């Protein structure tokens, strides 16, 4: 994958997250902001999830209260380089814990 393909795929990931949060109808307040290639999800309790892109490595990084995760694209899924879990699974687990209610991005 070249840099422009990486950015296209990361932009697509950001857009999907933003769209899902735009349609969020849960009880808690969840905000999403993109600034300089960094996507920040802020929860009602003040906690945050930070998602950013690491262009030199062609990775997406996810920082949550539970820890940090690095994802490589394998096929059409972003996969954690340590646990083998998908980006969506780990994001949903973290968002659910930080929101205090079930959050789904799919």
UniProtKB/Swiss-Prot annotation:
UniProt GO BP: iron-sulfur cluster assembly
CDD domains with a match to the protein in the record: Frataxin
GO cellular component: cytosol
SS bond list: none
Keyword Iron: yes
Molecular-function annotations in GO: ferric iron binding; ferrous iron binding
Keywords recorded for this protein, A-Z: Iron, Metal-binding
Role summary: Involved in iron-sulfur (Fe-S) cluster assembly. May act as a regulator of Fe-S biogenesis.
PANTHER family, per database record: FRATAXIN, FRATAXIN, MITOCHONDRIAL
NCBIfam families for this protein: FeS_CyaY (TIGR03421)
Entry's family note: Belongs to the frataxin family.
Protein name in the entry: Iron-sulfur cluster assembly protein CyaY
Species this protein is from: Escherichia coli O9:H4 (strain HS)
């Amino acid at each position: 994958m070249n840099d422009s393909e990486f950015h296209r795929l990361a932009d697509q990931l950001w857009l999907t997250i933003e769209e899902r949060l735009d349609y969020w109808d849960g009880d808690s307040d969840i905000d999403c902001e993109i600034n300089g290639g960094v996507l920040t999800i802020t929860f009602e309790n003040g906690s945050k999830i930070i998602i950013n892109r690491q262009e030199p490595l062609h990775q997406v990084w996810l920082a949550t209260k539970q820890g940090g995760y690095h994802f490589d694209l394998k096929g059409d899924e972003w996969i954690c380089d340590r646990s083998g879990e998908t980006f969506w699974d780990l994001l949903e687990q973290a968002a659910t814990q930080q929101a205090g209610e079930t959050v789904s991005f799919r």
